């Protein structure tokens, strides 16, 4: 059986990246909450590139 998690950087950033969050009202609310909480990484696209 194929595992459910098949990682892809492109798909991940398109779905959960900063620009994807900024597109919707709900996404902007998520960013606002994470800023208020003091998160160093707001979205997955803020993670350091491994290469």
Curated annotation (Swiss-Prot):
InterPro entries: Ribosomal_bL34, Ribosomal_bL34_CS. Keywords: Ribonucleoprotein, Ribosomal protein. GO terms for biological process: translation. Disulfide bonds: none annotated. Pfam families: Ribosomal_L34. One of its GO terms (cellular component) is ribonucleoprotein complex. GO terms for molecular function: structural constituent of ribosome. Signal peptide: none annotated. Belongs to the bacterial ribosomal protein bL34 family. This is Large ribosomal subunit protein bL34. It comes from Borrelia turicatae (strain 91E135). The gene is rpmH.
